[in-house]
């Protein structure tokens, strides 16, 4: 058994529902999206950060099982300069933002307590604000 399955079995015995955040490898999110759909069916909430690519096989799973898709979009900063909605990942060794992210991102929510699916757009600065990100 893999560790996640063991943890889920223990949680199921306790009757606790999980709230899970997943940032899978952008190169192959399919198995992670499939697992998120399974976890939703088991009663758990899964929130994922994914590449904004709606032309993929894994996006069809999102259409069938997710409840919310939030496209992360650009914005004008306080000086009026345009900022893309692309998320810069922090290098764990240097602590500095990695360069070269050429794709946008989206947040996908799998929630067993909500029916249907909605798509929204939210500027990256608002997401940072809501998340407590400090400049």
Describe each PLM feature range.
Residues 1-135:
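Class I S-adenosyl-L-methionine-dependent methyltransferase catalytic core
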